[in-house]
Amino acid sequence: MVNRDRLAETFKFLAEIDSVSKEERAISREIKKILESMGAKIWVDGAGDKIGGDTGNLIAKFKGSRKAPPLLLNAHMDTVEPGKGVTAVLSDGVFTSDGTTILGADDKSAIAIILETIKIIRENDLAYGPLELVFTVCEEIGLLGAKHLDLDLITAKLGYSLDATDTEGIVTRAPSANHLEFKVHGKDAHAGAAPEKGINAISLASRAIAGLELGRIDHETTCNIGIIEGGTATNIVPNLVTVKGEVRSHDEEKLNKITHAMVSSFKGVVDNYKGMSSDHGLPGLETKIQKDFSRTSIPEDHPVVKLACRAADNLGRKLVTKTSGGGADANIFFEKGIMTGVLGTGMRDMHTVRESVGLDDMVRATELLLEIIRLHTLD
């Protein structure tokens, strides 16, 4: 029933539209045209204005032909860099870029799958219940679209986000994440003529970082320092450095413990030096902690999981529940009371120029989504 050629054409069309974070207007317009041609009612919310983007989240609703609880389907429209000027190449059944950019299968493979699913339903006059499609902006830079989604437009209480790799899995657990920013203030001085008059902010930050346990802490907790910015010239003792990092965990107690350890390491180094310094108030430390997203944990006996597993069974497949180390729009929907499982599209090596997605995987994902909608309508 899936039109492979059409699915491939749709994905290639979408992949080659520039849509890096905060610049999703062009792809949103094209998705809107396709959905309107199939009879959808469309809204664009005000998320773009709130986050400094050129458009908001795109919400499309289909009334359905049968009475059933509304079902949410989600994908995000933005991509990471390098994501401009993409050429999508299909070879031996696998899409890649030309090697100079990402492909954008994350998450345009999901958009193509959702659009193909709706086309199949409409052209075959299949029974279906109300559908609420949510195509978000700025997922890649902090789930910002989902965080600013106009919930007055959403009535669904369960749904599926297509933003994982494995087409034979459903992600039911994802971690909480804290974002941390440290600004270490030192004192500038000439590095050659009078280095002893300076306080090297980079050196202090380095000591604090050296005292941290980074990488995989345990099976459900990670810690990372990802950005260090500071210094103006090699002959100047740097008076400021900014360090940014994150902690993720499926356990809130562990999340808070590692977050506290990071803060303590920086504070300890700065306070220790300050105790030996004759410069009033220096060195100094500014600390910011922001909750990026909260963990999700959907029980295996929840209807959103059971429905997807039944659909897979009907197709002669077995869907396995999975745990993710990353965040997705589903984390935010979960916070807002919408139980959202995350399904795979087959995408691989996301966020790299080696990114790929197999057409067979996209077909399998479409078949699963069709069966989920069919069963949901019957239930």
Language model regions located:
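Glycine/charged-rich beta-loop-alpha catalytic/anionic-binding loops adjacent to active sites
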Residues: L90-I102, H185-A189, L315-G316, M347-H351
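Acidic-glycine-rich active-site phosphate/pyrophosphate-binding loop
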Residues: D78-G93, V171-K183, C309-R310, G341
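A non-catalytic alpha/beta surface segment that caps or lines the substrate-entry region
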Residues: V20-K67
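N-terminal capping segment at the start of a domain
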Residues: M1-R25, K291, M350-T352
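Acidic, glycine-rich active-site loops and adjacent beta-strand->loop/helix elements
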Residues: G48, M77-T79, V134-G142, A164-D166, ...
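Acidic/histidine-rich catalytic neighborhood of metal-dependent amide-processing enzymes
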Residues: T101-P175, I217, T234-N235, E246, ...
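Active-site metal-coordination/substrate-binding segment of hydrolases
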Residues: S28, G53-N57, K61-K63, K67-P130, ...
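Metal-dependent amide/peptide-bond hydrolase catalytic core
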Residues: I202-D379
